């Protein structure tokens, strides 16, 4: 259900970027990742409710799994070279991304008691992970565009042009994470949720955000650069690996920062 909405919004944003002259690297990648998070969670809740009320859950699951495998087999063997290449490059990286996201969920589940002790952290968590993923997506998209257009060399050591993009994203990350902490604290106070002090929450967010930003730069650059150097499509590899890796490590660094500050 979620992918239908996200796919439609992606096409709309791409068309709008061309029509209105928006910077596609700064608009499409972060908005699509954010909207994906926004639509996926309600879709999962709705699907769980429908499955719980249906007496045909097992049969429906088997049918959907069969159809999915059939579609994948057809797409894998499709005669069009370009489409076949997209499918064969996308499936492995999306599979790895799914595993990373599952491990991230398991990490959060294991420390759920710590998160429930400061409910503002649960308010902050989706915004924190979404922000980290959006920033990484912007960097990966920018680098991919530069490599494709020959404006930058995909070298193991980032060039000056790549470093400018990296510095821009690092500078942008600090105020964005701080604003996220402020909003999470205000929302928690307004809804009667437990929260550490504002100072503690800001420190937790900056510590976790700093660690995540370092990893975001590393994963975004070397995934995009590596894909380009090996003749693969960096757009296919960069953003999925960045967002899924940051989901995993972002959850871990947030919990680590909670422990370091003494909130958990």
Range-by-range predicted roles:
Residues 1-6, 56-69, 126, 205, ...:
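Structural signature of hydrophobic alpha-helical transmembrane segments
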Residues 45-58, 109-123, 186-199, 256-264:
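Helix-coil boundary and interhelical linker segments in multi-pass alpha-helical membrane proteins
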Residues 135-192:
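Helix-loop-helix junctions within the multi-pass membrane cores of secondary transporters/permeases
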Residues 173-264:
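C-terminal transmembrane helix pair
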């Amino acid at each position: 259900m979620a992918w239908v909405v996200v796919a439609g919004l992606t096409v709309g944003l791409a068309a709008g970027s061309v029509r209105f002259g928006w910077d596609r690297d700064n608009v499409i990648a972060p908005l699509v990742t954010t909207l994906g998070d926004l639509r996926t969670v309600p879709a999962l809740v709705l699907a769980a409710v429908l499955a719980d009320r249906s007496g045909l859950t097992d049969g429906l699951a088997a049918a959907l799994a069969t159809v999915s495998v059939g579609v994948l087999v057809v797409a894998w063997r499709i005669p069009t070279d370009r489409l076949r290449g997209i499918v064969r490059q996308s499936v492995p990286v999306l599979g790895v991304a799914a595993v990373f996201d599952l491990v991230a969920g398991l990490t959060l589940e294991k420390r759920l008691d710590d998160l429930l002790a400061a409910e503002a952290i649960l308010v902050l968590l989706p915004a924190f992970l979404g922000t980290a993923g959006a920033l990484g997506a912007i960097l990966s998209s920018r680098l991919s565009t530069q490599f494709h257009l020959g404006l930058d060399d995909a070298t193991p050591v980032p060039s000056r042009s790549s470093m400018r993009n990296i510095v821009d994203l690092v500078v942008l990350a600090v105020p964005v994470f701080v604003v996220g902490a402020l909003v999470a604290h205000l929302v928690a106070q307004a809804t009667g949720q437990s929260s550490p002090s504002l100072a503690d929450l800001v420190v937790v967010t900056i510590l976790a955000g700093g660690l995540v930003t370092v990893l975001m730069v590393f994963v975004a650059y070397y995934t995009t650069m590596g894909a380009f150097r090996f003749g693969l499509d960096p757009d296919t590899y960069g953003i999925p690996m960045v967002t899924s890796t940051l989901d995993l490590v972002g959850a871990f660094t947030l919990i680590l920062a909670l422990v370091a500050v003494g909130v958990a």
